């Protein structure tokens, strides 16, 4: 399923989807990949689609201020879930994230991925 290509409009103050105005109606589901069990993901997506959401903003890495228990799956090798060995990606995590993104698209919702939160950048 394709949701169409997003572009910036001519005034550079909004988005177009396949040439038509696109309103970015998003939910911030920052910790989806680390904190939402697969059994709950379909329910969540169904509910957000019913509410008219068309975008989910998700961190690809664990949210720095997460307060909910994590599922214990990390994007990179880690002993504590805070410090990562960036040279050792966890393929199971990334496969799960990709499957969750595909499920969102199947519900008509675009994943908008935040690649790196500032706490992972030294000196920020």
Give the positions of each predicted feature:
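Active-site mouth of glycoside hydrolases
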Residues: 3-124
């Amino acid at each position: 399923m394709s949701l169409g290509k997003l572009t910036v409009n001519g005034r550079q103050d909004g988005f177009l989807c396949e040439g038509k105005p696109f309103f970015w109606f998003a939910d911030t589901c920052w910790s989806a990949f680390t904190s939402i069990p697969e059994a709950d993901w379909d329910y969540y997506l169904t509910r957000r689609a019913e509410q008219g959401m068309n975008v989910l903003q998700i961190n690809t890495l664990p949210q720095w201020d997460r307060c909910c228990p994590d599922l214990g799956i990390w994007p990179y090798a880690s002993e504590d879930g805070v410090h990562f060995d960036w040279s050792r990606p966890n393929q199971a995590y990334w496969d799960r994230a990709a499957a969750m993104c595909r499920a969102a698209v199947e519900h008509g919702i675009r994943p908008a991925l935040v690649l790196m939160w500032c706490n992972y950048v030294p000196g920020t």
